[in-house]
């Protein structure tokens, strides 16, 4: 869908699928984006992913993910129960927030990945945006 929309608007975009942790090196691009994936990784895997993204990015990396906090967990619990009757949704949403990193943790992981001058901002709903510019 993204590729189709970009082509309709004459925007150059390349999407690729790969093993994020052990696959071949990422192709070089101006910006490498990771969205709602980091919370599925442990600390070492997150560091590996950030290193691989930084190596491939010519300009910047962006990581948008869930932020673990008491408030976010409760908001997701309420929203999942109000908006869905699925027991999978009721369990998956809060569990994903519980498994996510908080902002100080993701900053520390970025530091361990060798990223300097990382910026982390709160984003709605229940997320943060980590940005690093080379």
Each language-model region and where it sits:
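Hydrophobic adenine-recognition pocket in adenosine-nucleotide-binding enzymes
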Residues: 37
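Conserved beta-strand signature within the Rossmann-like core of class I S-adenosyl-L-methionine
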Residues: 50-68
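C-terminal alpha-helical "lid/dimerization" subdomain adjacent to the S-adenosyl-L-methionine
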Residues: 66-119
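Short conserved loop adjoining the S-adenosyl-L-methionine
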Residues: 22-27, 43
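C-terminal lobe and adjacent flexible extensions of AdoMet/dcAdoMet transferase-like proteins
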Residues: 128-134
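Short, conserved active-site loop motifs that form the nucleotide-linked donor/cofactor pocket
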Residues: 12-14, 30, 118
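Class I SAM-dependent methyltransferase SAM/SAH-binding core
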Residues: 1-23
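A conserved beta-strand element that flanks and buttresses the S-adenosyl-L-methionine
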Residues: 33-34
